[in-house]
């Protein structure tokens, strides 16, 4: 299976660089994965596509203010993208610099000195030497790490809009974007309808934006991300399945978490890392339907939705979305694949 099979041409003006005024004002392309039937809707119509007995699974990870700036002791400028926090004084980060800092050297993260303990590929392990910890530095100086394709600096409103309304567990460097469409009002309507809700956690890593760089899909190595699928979520899923309801994953992060926990055919609680890679030919044991945004060409995420719904149907749906001027990527419109 070739990576080029998952390519498509997207007019640049369809990349959504800014969010709409209201979260739930986006559009929703409905795709029947059995028949390939496509229908255009408003996102708020989603309430009509779900029934009591269905279970919606959301990712409650919260985006960190992960972009920070600093310098070497020589004054040379540095830019950080915090990837993973080990403890308040110890963290993994990407560093953008003219010349890479050496292991053992001391550098500034904003106004605070840190020591470079290790380097693995493009990832540095830093330990803060000063009084402040990484949480305080992010709180005081941090920026929302917008995806590179937005081609703009973060603005004040991004701190709210690039975060889901139910975000709780700090740790992502990118938003679980399918959840951005859900307003507090829509969440309330879902509850009022008698549809059950559950939360898992997957902390999205920067690898989510990494294009597949090998020719053969099967030889791609996925980045690892930290997930938590609690016992009570597994119980809800079993109950939903037994009663004939559907498990509807909100976003590919929820899909990957649930399918990791259900890899043996039976959903089990899971805490730890996942590098699950779902591409055509892979089986889904847990998820019956999903809400997802439109994904980048040749990305692992367009491969995931192609595994769920069949590649030809997905490419056709994307062609329809382009023709109908849907908005693409993180701040863009969504699909309901069922």
From Swiss-Prot:
Listed InterPro entries: QueA (IPR003699), QueA_dom1 (IPR042118), QueA_dom2 (IPR042119), QueA_sf (IPR036100)
Catalytic reactions of this protein: 7-aminomethyl-7-carbaguanosine(34) in tRNA + S-adenosyl-L-methionine = epoxyqueuosine(34) in tRNA + adenine + L-methionine + 2 H(+)
Pfam families: Queuosine_synth
Domain of life: Bacteria
Family: Belongs to the QueA family.
Function: Transfers and isomerizes the ribose moiety from AdoMet to the 7-aminomethyl group of 7-deazaguanine (preQ1-tRNA) to give epoxyqueuosine (oQ-tRNA).
Protein name per Swiss-Prot or TrEMBL: S-adenosylmethionine:tRNA ribosyltransferase-isomerase
Organism: Francisella tularensis subsp. novicida (strain U112)
Encoding gene (name): queA
């Amino acid at each position: 299976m070739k990576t080029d099979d998952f390519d498509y041409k997207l007019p640049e003006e369809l990349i959504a660089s800014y969010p709409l005024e209201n979260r739930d004002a986006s559009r929703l392309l409905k795709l029947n994965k059995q028949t390939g039937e496509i229908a255009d809707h408003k996102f708020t119509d989603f309430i009509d596509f779900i029934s009591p007995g269905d279970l919606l699974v959301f990712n409650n990870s919260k985006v960190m203010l992960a972009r920070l700036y600093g310098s070497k002791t020589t004054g040379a400028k540095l830019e950080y993208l915090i990837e993973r926090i080990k403890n308040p004084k110890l963290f993994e980060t990407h560093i953008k610099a003219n010349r890479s800092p050496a292991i053992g050297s001391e550098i500034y993260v904003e106004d605070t000195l840190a020591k470079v303990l290790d380097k693995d590929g493009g990832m540095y392990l830093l330990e803060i030497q000063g009084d402040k910890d990484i949480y305080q530095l992010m709180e005081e100086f941090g920026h929302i790490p917008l995806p590179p394709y937005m081609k703009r600096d973060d603005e004040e409103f991004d701190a709210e809009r690039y975060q889901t309304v139910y975000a709780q567990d700090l740790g992502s460097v990118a938003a679980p974007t399918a959840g951005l469409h859900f307003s507090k009002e829509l969440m309330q309507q879902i509850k009022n309808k008698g549809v059950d809700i559950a939360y898992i956690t997957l902390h999205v890593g920067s690898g989510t934006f990494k294009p597949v760089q090998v020719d053969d899909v099967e030889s791609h190595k996925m980045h690892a991300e930290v997930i938590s699928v609690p016992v009570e979520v597994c119980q809800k899923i079993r109950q939903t399945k037994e009663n004939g309801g559907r498990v509807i994953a909100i976003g590919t992060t929820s899909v990957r978490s649930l399918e990791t926990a259900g890899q043996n055919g039976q959903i089990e609680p899971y805490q730890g890392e996942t590098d699950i890679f779902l591409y055509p030919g892979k089986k889904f044991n847990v998820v019956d339907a999903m809400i997802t945004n439109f994904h980048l060409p040749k990305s692992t995420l367009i491969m995931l939705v192609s595994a769920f719904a069949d590649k030809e149907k997905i490419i056709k749906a994307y062609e329809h979305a382009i023709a109908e001027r849907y908005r693409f990527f993180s701040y863009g419109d969504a699909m309901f694949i069922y």
